[in-house]
Design a protein with these regions (language model features):
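Bacterial signal peptide processing site
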Residues: 22-25
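Bacterial N-terminal signal peptides that target proteins for export
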Residues: 1-10
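Short aromatic-acidic-glycine turn motif
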Residues: 76-89
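C-terminal motif of bacterial Sec signal peptides marking the signal peptidase cleavage site
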Residues: 17-20
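N-terminal edge beta-strand
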Residues: 29-56
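Asparagine-centered strand-capping/turn motif at beta-strand->loop junctions
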Residues: 60-64
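Beta-strand signatures of extracellular beta-sandwich domains
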Residues: 69-73
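Extracellular/periplasmic metallocenter environments
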Residues: 98-144
């Protein structure tokens, strides 16, 4: 085998090996889809751990029989502190919110969101409508 053919074979093999090793990189071409299903009285998400600076595309579907809202909110006063708050106070805490008018039964709403920094303490996905949060309609998430 000539040196030229041997060199070409080595380069081709190295290129294939390097290409095969490069598949674990994060997809930076677009937002990360997050599918969220709301029901009575549950929140289920395809993603529960998020990174600051990454764009997430939330696809929120109300699979329940009553209207719900979807909020990303810091946990206050051990979580149940929301029980004594007005709706205006809850809305003011929201990092992101889709209102109950937008989420009647069967509705799907899509929204993009970027966690710009890690909020202090814990955060949750929440439906803060009267009685919904108290019935267990929240789900802890992490931003790391």
């Amino acid at each position: 085998m000539s040196y030229t053919k041997l060199f070409g074979f080595v380069i081709a093999t190295a290129t294939l090996l390097l290409a095969a090793c490069g598949g674990n990189q994060a997809n930076t071409d677009g937002p990360v889809d997050v599918k969220v299903a709301l029901g009575e009285f549950t929140i289920k998400s395809s993603v529960t751990e998020f990174k600051p600076g990454v764009q997430y595309h939330f696809i929120v579907t109300n699979e329940g029989q009553v209207a719900h809202e979807f909020m990303i909110i810091p946990v206050t006063m051990g979580g149940m502190g929301m029980a004594g708050m007005s709706m205006e106070e809850k809305d003011a805490l929201a990092l992101m919110m889709i209102s109950e008018e937008e989420l009647p039964p069967g509705a799907t709403v899509e929204m993009d969101y970027i966690f710009t920094s890690v909020p202090e303490g814990s955060i949750e996905f929440v439906c803060a409508l009267p009685g919904h949060f108290e019935a267990g309609m929240y789900s802890p998430i992490a931003v790391k």
